[in-house]
Amino acid sequence: MPLAVTLEGCRVRLEPLSLSHVAALVRAATQARDTFAFTMVPADHAAMTRYVQAALADQSTGWALPFAIYDLRSQAVVGSTRFLDLDYWSWPPAWPPGRTTPRPDAIPTVAEIGSTWLAPAVQRTGCNTESKLLMLGHAFDTWGVLRVTLKTDARNARSRRAIERIGGRFEGIRRAHARAVDGSVRDTAYYSIVAAEWPDARAALAARMSALPPLGRPATGWPGGTRAGLSTWTCRAAPRDRSRRSPGGCPTAPRLASGACPKSGSAPRPTSAETRSR
């Protein structure tokens, strides 16, 4: 089963999803909900609690690994994302006879990244791009997966453009595939990145991150955030990396153009004690 792990870049930290995130997720989900037309995003505390509980139940079976997205600029949880549809092509079989969960040492062979949503205030700020870079790096460079799937409602032009920007290759439309958020039957657009494509996709994502404007103060009035200490911003290193900070604030000396964080241009490293999924 995959390990629960924290992945940190220069703009976001992906934290293992837990019930302690519910209140912050509700705050993020109550902004301009018209942006969630194609995504199931609970709007109140009770529904968000059920949402997180369902994600954790999927994690307990080895099928998913969910995260809360923490924005390092606003110092607030701003959304959620996850690995899902994890499959294990191992021998001996990942699922021992009579068990419905994979062996503790089973590593995913293929994965999907999905169930992603972000508060409107941080959309198109690099949070999604860096989240994908961190997750793709973990999937390909840590797990060694062969393929990562990304999919969305075929009508969701914005999501499809975002997937294409991060290197997803269009595979086709699966017709009448699932029930949409509005209750209609949706067609689903499928994309993927395979292992052979990952080096080019990683370089393109790192270039996109380096082209983003420098981070400054968060927008006034961000729910749950704070402006304290954010007149200048440096990326946060893991405790074990603090002795290796470069002058610009990120661990390790090489920096990308425009002050981008080198952590986001390479395989992400776990930043907190890892615990096995339960």
Regions found by a protein language model. Give the residues of each.
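Conserved GNAT acetyl-CoA-binding A-motif
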Residues: 141-151
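GNAT-family acyltransferases
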Residues: 1-125, 138, 142, 178, ...
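Compositionally biased, low-complexity flexible segments
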Residues: 235-252
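Conserved catalytic-core motifs of GNAT/GCN5-like acyltransferases
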Residues: 151, 169-184, 257-260
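Conserved acetyl-CoA-binding loop-helix of GNAT-fold acetyltransferases
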Residues: 124-138, 161
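Conserved active-site alpha-helix within GNAT-family acetyltransferase domains
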Residues: 156-172, 265, 275-277
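Conserved beta-strand-loop-alpha-helix junction that forms the acyl-donor binding cleft
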Residues: 118, 150-160, 260
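Vicinal oxygen chelate
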Residues: 70, 80-82, 254-278
